[in-house]
Amino acid sequence: MLSALGGNLSNARQSIAQVLNFALVLSTAFMLWKGVSIASNSSSPIVVVLSGSMEPAFQRGDLLFLWNRAERTEVGEIVVYNVRGRDIPIVHRVVRSYTEEDKKLKAKNKKAGLPTVAPQKLLTKGDNNLADDTELYARGQDFLDRKEDIIGSVRGYIPGVGYVTIMLSEHPWLKTVLLGVMGLMVILQRE
């Protein structure tokens, strides 16, 4: 009877150890993601190219690394932005930049003794597109606001690696297969 109880405790310990190891892996991945987000000053420091609008510079499925620490964005720079009201990142090149003087901000900063930096407005376009992105922007928006809309500027990429993400989102059954294989590996590893 005691040997059966000891075997059950051993299985319980093994199960708890596996759950804790899995939690450790998840929390480590989350902390790494947050650390990279803070270092790059970008809410999403790694994105996948979802369309062919930036060909030949970037292909669908390329993994992009973003940086958002620069004060200004230059014409010709490739940026990733979110359209207000939608949560799909768009990767396009800045084709025009200008600053818009905000009289209220200028008066407020002058009163506080702070320098006034006019907000930067950007117009973007995909390299493989004929027209600029004004049709993609939110209703009534003609330009992107540098501080509000830009997720980051592209600083590096790995070709094709992000295609796994695209496949998983386009074919939901692949997620089920992947989870089943992972579960099977956990069960087989226990023995």
Curated annotation (Swiss-Prot):
Q: Which residues lie on this side of the membrane: Cytoplasmic?
A: 1-18
The membrane topology of this protein is: Single-pass type II membrane protein
- Name the InterPro entries on file: LexA/Signal_pep-like_sf (IPR036286), Pept_S26A_signal_pept_1_Ser-AS (IPR019756), Peptidase_S24_S26A/B/C (IPR015927), Peptidase_S26 (IPR019533), Peptidase_S26B (IPR001733)
Q: Does the keyword Cell cycle apply?
A: no
For this protein, the record's PROSITE patterns field holds: SPASE_I_1
Residues of this chain annotated as glycosylated in UniProt: 41
Residue ranges spanning the membrane: these are 19-39
List the GO molecular function terms: serine-type endopeptidase activity
Cite the domain annotation text.
The C-terminal short (CTS) helix is essential for catalytic activity. It may be accommodated as a transmembrane helix in the thinned membrane environment of the complex, similarly to the signal peptide in the complex substrates.
Q: What is this protein called in UniProt?
A: Signal peptidase complex catalytic subunit sec11
* Species in which this protein is naturally found: Talaromyces marneffei (strain ATCC 18224 / CBS 334.59 / QM 7333) (Penicillium marneffei)
Query: What is the primary gene name for this protein?
Result: sec11
